[in-house]
């Protein structure tokens, strides 16, 4: 019988340390809700999870970018809607002035309103902005929308299709001071109505495209989050079982260590 080395106590102490360490890990996982809290828990899983997280955040931001694109389109489309209304009124004035029952004074009054509406189109062209960017003049030709999590995933919005510069220039050359000029103005306005309609149609198509883009991005983000969760999140029920197991083993180890420490006391019986 030896007393310098108590192997049963040493084994019990070693197992108690192992159980205590496993119990602490289980507590950390249960408190954080994560299976992987540091690289040592699962190095490969952590690398995959972080890559997925980067993609998820990129997809979510791309969705917000697309929403911003829709807001820009709605701003431009709202302005064009008002231009449409103005053109309709201008055409109405031109048709009225074309009627030769109007005297010169009547036509002059009609032309005054006509010219004011031309100036209003110019004002809309010059002041319609989104985040300080002018949308309806020739200041900006295209807007690149980042609609993906990775580089190069872009949608280009062509603002030249809604540029009002040419429309304003064409209308500024018209007047309805007499029958002949009013007839010419009707034809010119019809051309500009067509141009504005085409611009609004383009914006509507782009908005519909972005709405589908957002749905796809949100769906991809949701699926990727589910995949990332399977890698990184802890199974609470399973981990609770592990915590309970290690807790029981730890208590048992403590009890066995106490028993092992009592064994050398038997040596004292030999010395009596």
UniProtKB/Swiss-Prot annotation:
Keyword Secreted: yes
Signal sequence residues: none
UniProt cross-references to Gene3D superfamilies, sorted A to Z: f41 fragment of flagellin, middle domain (2.170.280.10), f41 fragment of flagellin, N-terminal domain (1.20.1330.10), Flagellar export chaperone, C-terminal domain (6.10.10.10)
Any GO molecular function: structural molecule activity
Keyword Secreted assigned: yes
Entry keyword set: Bacterial flagellum, Secreted
Database matches in InterPro entries: Flagellin (IPR001492), Flagellin_C (IPR046358), Flagellin_C_sub2 (IPR042187), Flagellin_N (IPR001029)
Main location as per UniProt: secreted
GO CC terms of this entry: bacterial-type flagellum; extracellular region
Localization per Swiss-Prot or TrEMBL: Secreted; Bacterial flagellum
PANTHER family per the UniProt record, alphabetical: FLAGELLIN (PTHR42792:SF2)
Job description of the protein: Flagellin is the subunit protein which polymerizes to form the filaments of bacterial flagella.
Family in the record: Belongs to the bacterial flagellin family.
Identification of the protein by name: Flagellin
